[in-house]
Amino acid sequence: MLRLINKTINKNDLIKINNSKRFCSTTTNSTINKDNIYDIIIIGGGLVGSTMACSIGNNNTTKHLKVALIESSKIQTVEQSISNAIPEIRTISFNNQTIELFKSINVWDTIKSTKRVNPFNQVRVWDTSGFEGIHFQDNDIIDDGNNTTAMGYIIENNIVTSSLLSKVKQFENIELFEQLSVKSMNDYNEETIRTTSILPSVTLSNDQQLHAKLIIGADGGNSILKKQLQVPSIGRVYNQKAVVCTLKLGIKQDNNNNSSNNNNNNNNTLFQRFLPTGPIALLPLANGYANIIWSTNLMHAQYLLELDDESFLEQVKDSFLKSPSTSNSSFFEIASNLFNLNPKGLSGNEIYLPPIEGLVSKRASFPLRIDHTFNYTLPRVCFIGDASHLVHPMAGQGVNLGMADVKTLSSIIEQSVQSGYDIGDAMMLKRFEEIRKPENLKMLLSIDTLFNLFTNNSIFVTGLRNFGMSLLNNISPLKNLIIGVSKGESILKFK
């Protein structure tokens, strides 16, 4: 598997975290205050960590387990998260598998009640070459038996997180530690934990010490837990930043977020264009708003952040609508005629974006990188979400991969309880890694390959790329396969 990674990622860009041996001294269980012993400690109360807590608390088999959820930030109520009519700049594209997970833990109705949920049923992807892009829409979607026609849902991060944490507070078995972080793992020792009955422990920023049969790291791409345990990972920095902001669109939507069907007055289409410096995406939000995620090189990102609002909006419009280069058109025409492909008219000057009224938020940016943890599990420790795998946001799959981790780990914990196993049993945790690592690696490598493909501007690569998009746009089964993956369906099958 690592050989596959090395083939995909440039070795010169690799970042390898030192894997030093974890030595320690450990407190014996007999000296522990029983009130501080938990079945599970979840570090990180963001989207993935809070969903993990809800999944345990809402399951009849596991709801008796004593859980500690540790979150370093101040927690918002649902009411606070919707108090500002303008959406926040951090938004997530949730696939249908994640929505089904939200339904199973009885939090989807709360999220929907905010009226800040926006489904999208079309995706338009193209580049600057002037040939053909890809158009996914409703009639490309195979009925999944759940009457689900939306390709996904764009929702603000804080809306979902506050809804999840509101649900967490309803569970008697879950204790929420707010505005506290993990200060120390108390000299965690793999060998001692593996071969004795001693439980691992964490010391919080208030010096409180907690012990657990299983510690779950869900504290994001800069995981403190992973750093303290010196868990090795492999990856690279893209030397890019994503510039994000919120726009107000010139469209009207009813209370159900339905908009006009006119080409330029529809807020249920996700637009993405691959520029020479990186992709820009317009994500449709509820109530006539949209989120911009513009991935670009460091110098250009700084330039975009320093522009005045009017100039920045002009840059956004030009990036989507500026006429493409036609220098390679002869190559495309030959390929199109040879394979009898029919371009769908997705060149930049034929895209109908919703009218943009203005910029309604500050602009922010965050660095982009790819990262994958070698080991998802240690004795009585498991990593999920961005703590174990980071991907480029261009495909919108980062959080969805984390939610798939939650679903798998929840199932394994349930099986452990049903079978009478220790929930921190190494064999059961290893099963989690065997299931999730191939899935996550597959998506991570696919997205990294796409990034490399779309940021390579040589004539040969550009020609192959556009020929591939044209071919894909004319083969329905292949389009359905890609839609299935984007909705969270697995190509790999496990017994």
From Swiss-Prot:
Pathway membership, UniProt: Cofactor biosynthesis; ubiquinone biosynthesis
Biological-process GO terms, alphabetical: ubiquinone biosynthetic process
Enzyme type, top EC level: oxidoreductase
Subcellular location, record wording: Mitochondrion inner membrane
Cofactor needs: FAD
GO cellular component: extrinsic component of mitochondrial inner membrane; mitochondrion
Any Pfam family hit: FAD_binding_3
Swiss-Prot/TrEMBL catalytic activity: a 4-hydroxy-3-(all-trans-polyprenyl)benzoate + 2 reduced [2Fe-2S]-[ferredoxin] + O2 + 2 H(+) = a 3,4-dihydroxy-5-(all-trans-polyprenyl)benzoate + 2 oxidized [2Fe-2S]-[ferredoxin] + H2O; a 2-methoxy-6-(all-trans-polyprenyl)phenol + 2 reduced [2Fe-2S]-[ferredoxin] + O2 + 2 H(+) = a 2-methoxy-6-(all-trans-polyprenyl)benzene-1,4-diol + 2 oxidized [2Fe-2S]-[ferredoxin] + H2O
One function term, GO molecular function aspect: 2-methoxy-6-polyprenolphenol 4-hydroxylase activity
InterPro entries xrefs: FAD-bd, FAD/NAD-bd_sf, UbiH/COQ6, UbiH/COQ6_monooxygenase, UbQ_mOase_COQ6
Membrane disposition: Peripheral membrane protein
Additional comment: This protein may be expected to contain an N-terminal transit peptide but none has been predicted.
Protein family per UniProt: Belongs to the UbiH/COQ6 family.
NCBIfam families linked to this entry: Ubi-OHases (TIGR01988)
Protein name per UniProt: Ubiquinone biosynthesis monooxygenase COQ6, mitochondrial
Species classification: Eukaryota, Amoebozoa, Evosea, Eumycetozoa, Dictyostelia
